[in-house]
From Swiss-Prot:
GO terms for cellular component: cytoplasm. Changing I4V: Forms a domain-swapped homotetramer. The keyword Disulfide bond does not apply. This is Phosphopantetheine adenylyltransferase. It catalyses: (R)-4'-phosphopantetheine + ATP + H(+) = 3'-dephospho-CoA + diphosphate. It comes from Helicobacter pylori (strain ATCC 700392 / 26695) (Campylobacter pylori).
Length: 157
């Protein structure tokens, strides 16, 4: 059976920090599913289709990465793909508190599921999608924070 990991997120928009985690985690799995969440509760700036297109463009050079959109429980998506490992990023202490709760919740729904946490590299530690959204909303230049393939798409927002 293939070793499969799932890296879920809203990716609104995808950042260099996300790509760094995709790069590092894709080396640990035969297949990495990047799962773009519907996340209507977060009121995303970009539509699900736009976010999926952006992540596909940004990951096209990764041979073992597949990008999918999903709605519903992540634990169910993991079962669908026969995945036993979730990949998550931790930038700050508050991320850990949230991710720990989510990890326990996912484990309670799917007992085979483990969560693997990645700390960002130093140059990406401060980057978040919300910072990028704020910069582009104020007509600033966020090109150094996102993959070059997607900057033309987000700079029009």
């Amino acid at each position: 059976m293939q070793k499969i990991g799932i890296y879920p997120g809203t990716f609104d928009p995808v950042t260099n920090g996300h790509i760094d985690i995709i790069h590092r985690s894709s080396e640990l799995f035969e297949k990495l599913i990047v799962a773009v969440a519907h996340s209507s509760a977060k009121n995303p700036m970009f539509s699900l289709d736009e976010r999926l297109k952006m992540i596909q463009l940004a990951t096209k050079s990764f041979k073992n990465v597949e990008c999918v959109a999903f709605e519903g429980l992540l634990a169910n998506l993991a079962k669908e793909y026969h995945c036993k490992v979730l990949v998550r990023g931790l930038r700050v202490v508050s991320d850990f508190e949230y991710e720990l709760q989510m990890g326990y919740a996912n484990k309670s729904l799917n007992h085979e599921l483990e969560t693997l946490y990645f700390m960002p590299t130093l140059q990406n530690a401060f980057i978040s999608s919300s910072i990028v959204r704020s910069i582009i909303a104020h007509k600033g230049d966020a090109s150094h924070l996102v993959p070059k393939e997607i900057y033309p798409l987000i700079s029009k927002a």
